[in-house]
């Protein structure tokens, strides 16, 4: 309701201004014809009125800005009112084999204040160095699953176990430190390529390590062409880089962290299939102990995955390799056919 009246404020102000001018000009014409008012007096009256009306327009714009600021302030207050997260509370310690890194059993998750769960009864496991693919349509639960894996939301019951060298994390802070995450919509910050790559790192890194991460992310070639190389300028929002270049730089930043888990959430969507294939092969060859979780809309991206989760309406519809799903899942075949024109 507030937004409705705010949107009407400016056009209503201009309507009143122009309507008033029209009335004055019409009445002035009548007064001049009756020799009650001179032409000079009419022009002076219009000029004075315009000055007043211009300030009224400014006042209307100020009121609109204040209204928007008030709404934004209320939202910020809601964020500050949230209870702080306790990321240092100890989690239950568990052990597993060195190969086992992720185990999900009957995962169910419901967003706060939501009536229905977004994820229901999802189970799978993952071994060290494997590639896990996740695919599904809009509303299938891909984003919800990622947010739970990242520790941003708790599951409805304890159903996710994360391991590193056979041991589970001590607390939520350590849980999150084990995961590098790259979203589809990536952000670069004003500075240099070096400052963007090392953003958030707690340890010093060498130029050799920076170039290695760029090479894995298939970003070395275009960075080598930049004036200043690693110290080349990055404009705010990465405006001087294409979408694919920004995605590759963000992947290089995640690779540099050397976390045991790497999640690429549709983070190669702006890359062509050849570059994408080279990038995924480079991750597998150069980071053999890193477990990669790959969310994508393209079946071609997931063909090298050790297993693929096919989600639909928050449930696990099918699981297996690309070849297995092509044989066993009609839904997966339809997704593949819609992208390639045939069921291959």
PLM regions: where:
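An intracellular "coupling" helix at the cytosolic face of ABC transporter transmembrane type-1 domains
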Residues: 1-19, 34, 65-68, 85, ...
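Cytosolic ends of transmembrane helices, especially the final helix of ABC transmembrane type-1 domains
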Residues: 4, 52-79
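Transmembrane alpha-helix boundary/anchor motif
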Residues: 20-27, 54, 71, 218
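Membrane-water interface of transmembrane alpha-helices in multipass transporters/channels
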Residues: 34-47
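Conserved catalytic core of two-component sensor histidine kinases
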Residues: 46, 53, 176
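Pre-NBD coupling/linker segments of ABC/ABC-like ATPases
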Residues: 85-97
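ABC-type nucleotide-binding domain
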Residues: 96-344
